[in-house]
Amino acid sequence: MYKSLRIALPVALVLLGLFVLIGTGVIGKGRDANFLRQDFAWLWSAGHMMLGGENAYDYDTFRPVLMSVVGQHAGNAYAYPPHLGPIAMHWGALPFEIGAWVLTAENVVFTLLLAGGVFMLVRQATGERWYAATAAGLMLMCPYAAHVTAMGQTSLLVAAALLWGWYFTYRDKPIVGGVLLAIAAIKPMFLVLPVVWLLLNRKWVA
């Protein structure tokens, strides 16, 4: 019976995590309609403008484009660093609704990559598949993952890039690691301490 419970717990956590992620993050159950894909509007507007050769950092030009998809709630400027531009453009090249669903699907993939990374690292640290599977299930159940997916944010992209960038950097694959860490730098505040740590460990090639 104990063995059966050990198998059942991580499986249940993974299935429950996927249920929460898809139900509240993808489908949007229990969330206000105005909340869904809200942050994606900034990303799409910037990418759409960049494809047209316009400056997304000019608020007077940016605001009308943003208002065309979010109405009167457009208050903040586009504040991401320039190297998010190519990523934003692949959303902006699509109609708004289709682009939003593309990012939603990508956020599900990023969540799975995070869960896979957690599984791998915990298994390496403990040597136990059970602990690793349980940790991965808890990662999938994280309410923040569903929240970010529903809003259309980039935090899951940043987290997945940071985790796997760190992994490859410490396995002497600085090019892959460096590219992933550069992607994570679209939110620089999450990269300050990891970069300091890498420098202290003489991993500055990344």
Question: For each of these PLM feature ranges, what is it?
Answer:
Residues 17-124, 128:
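TM-lumen/periplasm interface segments of multi-pass membrane proteins
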Residues 1-26, 132-134:
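Start-transfer (signal-anchor) and selected internal transmembrane alpha helices
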Residues 149-155:
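Short acidic/glycine- and proline-prone juxtamembrane loop motifs at membrane-interface regions
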Residues 94, 141, 169, 183-187, ...:
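Transmembrane helix irregularities
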Residues 125, 130-145:
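Transmembrane and membrane-interface helices of multi-pass
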Residues 192-206:
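Perimembrane helix-loop-helix junctions
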Residues 96-98, 127-133, 171-176, 203-206:
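Membrane-helix interface segments
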Residues 117, 157-173:
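Specific aromatic-rich, kink-prone transmembrane helix
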